[in-house]
Amino acid sequence: MEDFSLDGNHGHVPVMRDRMAALIAEHVEALGENAVIVDATLGAGGHAEFFLNTFPKARLIGLDRDQNALRDARARLAPFGERFIGVQTRFDGLREVLESVEGDIIDLAREHGIAGALFDLGVSSMQLDQVERGFAYRTDAPLDMRMDATQGITAADILNTYSHGDIARILKTYGDERFAGKIASAVLKEREKEPFTTSARLVELLYDAIPAATRRTGGHPAKRTFQALRVEVNNELDSLKNVLPQITDALNVGGRAVFMSYQSHEDKLVKKFFTDLTTSKTPPGLPVDLPGTAPQFKQVTRGAETASEAEIEENPRAAPVKVRAIERIGNNSGDLS
């Protein structure tokens, strides 16, 4: 989510900013003042600001679970006045927002559906820069990792209370960690001496648990474990699974949803959902689609798009991004009224 390079007063330029706008441009411009865009991972507001400047007639709904990010984004986007509304929620709270929140922009979305939506997944650079949040493994900090600091368990809670099997499963599933079992054993042994509270102790454990040969070639030894803990703390995959049908249901005909994934498990979920949604339900072998079985969506991107070499050179955090976009082409269920 919002992995950035530097940009003037606000510090960051969103990854693939121009391409994200281009993917939704045609339909948003065609709808004019009836166009509602959803930035479901508002972060510092970089993408949202660019969209509002690029599409001067459009309105935008911004979602973020992080109250600090939402506060800063609201201040940044205040010049756009009533064209922007920000709501604190996980992005899989989208349906509830569209059904329950009051406001002119929400009413417009209920009446006309969503013209374009962006999901920039993962942790933001703004969160990484806030040492006390515990997302970064290169600086000693509390093992927190909550995107909404008022809710849920922390990374320390997981390390201090989860079973060996659950810790190993999390590290393997969410971090692709080859040494998940060995790390889990080391965690259980260490927490008997003293509960985990800060990141430096965990990083030291990981250096000891992961073989030297792997440390030399596999990147920072803490990267995969910290990623896995963050995903578990914030229920990131469940949120993604939940929101995929929510946003596609909310799109109007011609509306597009764009997902930026930085981890393989995220991209696999998006890819499978898009494939299922764009495949005819007609039994194989029939020459035409039976009534009611034709797909109501098409994939806009051919496979997953990636950042250009020039962008990666300017902003190395763009290197892993995979972009997929889908468009509603029929059966307008975007009308939520």
Swiss-Prot record:
Gene Ontology terms, MF aspect = rRNA (cytosine-N4-)-methyltransferase activity
Q: Which reaction does it catalyse?
A: cytidine(1402) in 16S rRNA + S-adenosyl-L-methionine = N(4)-methylcytidine(1402) in 16S rRNA + S-adenosyl-L-homocysteine + H(+)
UniProt name for this protein = Ribosomal RNA small subunit methyltransferase H
Name the Gene Ontology biological process terms.
rRNA base methylation
Its localization reads: Cytoplasm
Q: Which SUPFAM superfamilies match?
A: Putative methyltransferase TM0872, insert domain, S-adenosyl-L-methionine-dependent methyltransferases
Q: Which UniProt keywords apply?
A: Cytoplasm, Methyltransferase, rRNA processing, S-adenosyl-L-methionine, Transferase
Its function, per the record, reads: Specifically methylates the N4 position of cytidine in position 1402 (C1402) of 16S rRNA.
Gene3D superfamilies the UniProt entry points to: Putative methyltransferase TM0872, insert domain, Vaccinia Virus protein VP39
Q: Where along the chain is S-adenosyl-L-methionine bound?
A: G45, G46, H47, D64, F91, D120, Q127
The enzyme's first-digit EC class, named in words, is: transferase
> What does the sequence similarity comment in the record state about its family?
Belongs to the methyltransferase superfamily. RsmH family.
What gene does this protein come from? rsmH
- What's the short name of a Pfam family annotated to this entry? Methyltransf_5
For this record, an example GO cellular component is: cytoplasm
Q: What is the lineage of its organism?
A: Bacteria, Bacillati, Actinomycetota, Actinomycetes, Mycobacteriales
